[in-house]
Design a protein with these regions (language model features):
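C-terminal motif of bacterial Sec signal peptides marking the signal peptidase cleavage site
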Residues: 13-16
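Bacterial signal peptide processing site
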Residues: 18-20
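Extracytoplasmic small-molecule ligand-binding "clamshell" domains
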Residues: 22-91
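An extracytoplasmic/periplasmic, membrane-proximal ligand-sensing/linker region
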Residues: 28, 36-47, 236-300
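A bilobed periplasmic-binding-protein/Venus flytrap-type ligand-binding module shared by bacterial periplasmic
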Residues: 34, 115-126, 224-239
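Short helices/loops that flank or line small-molecule/ion binding pockets
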Residues: 69-83, 92, 96-97, 114, ...
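A conserved helix-loop-strand patch within extracytoplasmic ligand-binding domains
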Residues: 105-162
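Pocket-lining segment of extracytoplasmic ligand-binding domains
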Residues: 137-239
Length: 300
């Protein structure tokens, strides 16, 4: 049933998008993934919203979502003009020609990366991947968001590579809905095994006091994953798209405070960070991984 539900989610987000070549908009609608913290996120990016309004000379409305699927649907259905998408959500969205990749976050002009990890609670008898393989049938497994790279795609691909097909190898598989929910479910021993991101999830939850060091035990860490893509609706005018891109590329210099507030959702120190251009081809590795997983063939 959960496998069928996930396939239905993927089918839903791959619905057709608008076909206008030069969409006119009086208010720029920016989709933001806020996870489980919409109020805190809104406060942190308030300055960035004001910066965009000043640079673009138009009202800007931020739309907060608790999942990536809503962002993909929003831009595909012409309800959003700008979105920040996880690598996997970006790949899913590009199955329909609805967006233009603009920028990604960098440190010292170098694209930032992050990692996925598979974990259990600190006192668990599962200490490594061999233990996981041996006891999988006794364990419940939790992914984060269906359209998350680190919280779903990458760990799913890894588990399959070692002979563990999630739906068939584990006692039960669920989607928690977000990175914090995945980690807290395991911390509270409601789920045995979880999947999430290290730098952008676990470390932030530790800093915010949601989890203490040692309450989760890491079993596996992935290779580096390319970071999110900030994209524009392809139906916007070329002039507006270029203005949006320029505003993002210049924000760290023109309004450092607004920039720092925006990226503080993930990074505590923005002094060496900035946005740099990103390109579709940089996400080909994520595409290849997605296409290699039998359960995700519906993205084609």
């Amino acid at each position: 049933m959960k496998k069928l539900l996930f396939l239905l989610i993927l089918i839903t987000i791959l619905t057709s998008c608008g076909n206008n070549n030069s969409k006119t908009t009086s208010v720029l609608r920016v989709g933001i993934y806020s996870g489980d913290q919409p109020i805190q996120t809104k406060e942190k990016i308030k300055g960035f919203q004001q910066y965009l309004e000043k640079e673009l000379k138009m009202p800007v409305e931020f739309v907060f979502t608790s999942d990536y699927t809503t962002l993909v649907e929003g831009i595909q259905r012409d309800k959003l003009d700008v979105v920040q998408l996880s690598p996997f959500a970006y790949v899913l969205a590009t199955q329909k020609p609805c967006l233009v990749p603009l920028v990604t976050i960098a440190e010292n002009k170098i694209r930032t990366e992050y990692h996925s990890f598979i974990f259990t609670y600190g006192s668990s008898k599962i200490n490594n991947i061999e233990d996981l393989k041996k006891h999988a049938k006794e364990l419940t497994l939790c992914f984060a968001d269906p359209a998350s790279a680190s919280g779903h795609l990458i760990p799913r691909a890894y588990l399959k590579s070692i002979g563990l097909d999630p739906e068939n190898s584990f006692k039960e598989v669920i989607f928690a809905g977000s990175h914090p929910a995945s980690m807290l479910s395991v911390k509270n021993k409601k789920i045995d095994i979880g999947c999430s991101t290290t730098e952008l999830g676990y470390q932030r939850l530790v800093i915010n006091g949601g989890i203490k060091e040692g309450e989760l035990k890491s079993l596996w860490v992935s290779d580096p994953i390319i970071n999110d893509a900030i994209c524009a609706n392809k139906n916007l005018s070329t002039t507006l798209i270029e203005k949006i891109k320029k505003a993002y590329l210049e924000v760290d210099q023109k309004d450092p405070k607004a920039f720092a507030g925006s990226v503080s959702r993930y990074y505590s120190d923005a002094s060496h960070m900035q946005f740099i251009p990103t390109y579709d081809s940089l996400y080909n590795n994520i595409r290849n991984i997605a296409e290699s997983i039998k359960e995700l063939k519906t993205i084609k």
